[in-house]
């Protein structure tokens, strides 16, 4: 049974423990999930309120043309030049990943993915009958990519693609121009697909340039871009994403899956299209807030004895190393056995973002999607939890 092979979500699998803690009256600081708490653009919410239809019909399988045309102008601002026909609207970025895998890969084909990686990539590869081959990045090196030779060690006659997330979930790493050119050269040399998840492009904090896979010359037919409005506009619940590619054969294959699932969400597209008119100050305010939260979290983590976090360059996550024997045991313990003044923290055990056995055993992914006051308090609670945890691996309490 294929479902038995599907990995549990490291982000959501502890939800029953959290629910039980809340029943006991414990307040939980949710650092486990990338659900922004910042407001959805008013123009999107107003469009939702204005919906006045007598029938909520199917939308076109490719998505509304008006929305796709408007998206071309959005992408052009980032130097991504596409036409409306290059864009397929999906039910969230997750469906875009799944349809890309199902369209481009045969059972037994392999995808090279830097790890740690977003856990659902593994799940969708299993759904497609494909195999993830991971290439290790390390917290000590800030999760930068290894040299090209390490990639080539993994390439064989079943290798069909490389998958990246840029800026990265779960690490917050931003690929450099050198790294993107390295990936381009591999894609060109071995005629691979490049699946590029770029849903966090708005959130780059270092002044470094955003290098999209669509900027890479010579592999235009190999690139499949994955996008979503979920994190950009705090619209996770409307489930609107996009798959973008210049490759007509890939689009033709993807459309067969789109037609089989009938249509992307009608109401979600209305909200997402309207949200493209959000004023520039909306983006600035959201960006500035994440800059402050990032500093609050990373400074606070690195002040806790035994804890280390690199400085994430983008997105709104970090992977931190904790002085614990097993991060999943620690996260479970925080929810089931610990509280400090009636409060505790919920984090995502990082081992679930790796496929290499034993990797990430003492790491957690933390999302800085809470206001600074809550992040500051969550750091106090985390420090107290580490001081009390019986499986702590150092004596510096």
Question: Language-model features: where?
Answer:
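PLP-dependent class I/II
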Residues: 4-8, 14, 21-27, 33-51, ...
């Amino acid at each position: 049974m294929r479902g038995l092979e599907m990995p549990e979500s490291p982000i959501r699998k502890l939800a029953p423990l959290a629910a039980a803690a809340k029943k006991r009256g414990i307040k939980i600081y949710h650092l486990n999930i990338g659900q922004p708490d910042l407001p959805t653009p008013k123009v999107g919410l107003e469009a939702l309120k204005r919906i006045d239809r007598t029938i909520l019909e199917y939308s076109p399988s490719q998505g509304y043309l008006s929305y796709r045309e408007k998206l071309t102008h959005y992408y052009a601002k980032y130097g991504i030049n596409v036409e409306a026909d290059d864009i397929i609207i999906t039910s969230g970025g997750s469906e875009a990943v799944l349809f890309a895998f199902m369209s481009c890969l045969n059972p037994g084909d392999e995808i090279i993915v830097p790890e740690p990686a977003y856990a659902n990539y593994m799940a969708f590869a299993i759904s497609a009958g494909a195999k993830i081959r991971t290439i290790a990045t390390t917290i000590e090196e800030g999760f930068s990519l290894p040299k090209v030779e390490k990639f080539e060690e993994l390439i064989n006659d079943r290798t069909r693609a490389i998958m990246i997330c840029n800026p990265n979930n779960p690490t917050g790493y931003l690929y450099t121009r050198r790294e993107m050119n390295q990936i381009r050269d591999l894609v060109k040399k071995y005629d691979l697909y490049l699946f590029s998840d770029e849903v966090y492009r708005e959130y780059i904090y270092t002044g470094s340039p955003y290098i999209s896979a669509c900027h890479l010359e010579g592999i235009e037919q190999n690139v499949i871009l994955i996008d979503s409005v979920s994190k950009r506009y705090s619209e996770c619940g409307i489930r609107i994403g996009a798959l973008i590619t210049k490759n007509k054969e890939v689009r033709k294959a993807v459309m067969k899956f789109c037609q089989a699932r009938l249509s992307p969400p009608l109401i979600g597209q209305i909200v997402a299209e309207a949200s493209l008119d959000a004023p520039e100050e909306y983006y600035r305010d959201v960006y500035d807030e994440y800059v402050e939260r990032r500093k609050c979290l990373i400074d606070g983590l690195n002040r806790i004895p035994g804890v280390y976090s690199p400085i994430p360059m983008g997105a709104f996550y970090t992977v931190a190393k904790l002085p614990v024997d097993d991060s999943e045991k620690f996260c479970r313990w925080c929810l089931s056995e610990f509280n400090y003044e009636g409060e505790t923290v919920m984090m995502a055990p990082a081992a679930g973002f790796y496929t290499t056995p034993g990797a990430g055993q003492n790491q957690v992914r933390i999302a800085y999607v809470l206001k600074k006051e809550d992040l500051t308090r969550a750091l106090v609670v985390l420090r107290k939890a580490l001081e009390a945890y019986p499986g702590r691996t150092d004596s510096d309490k």
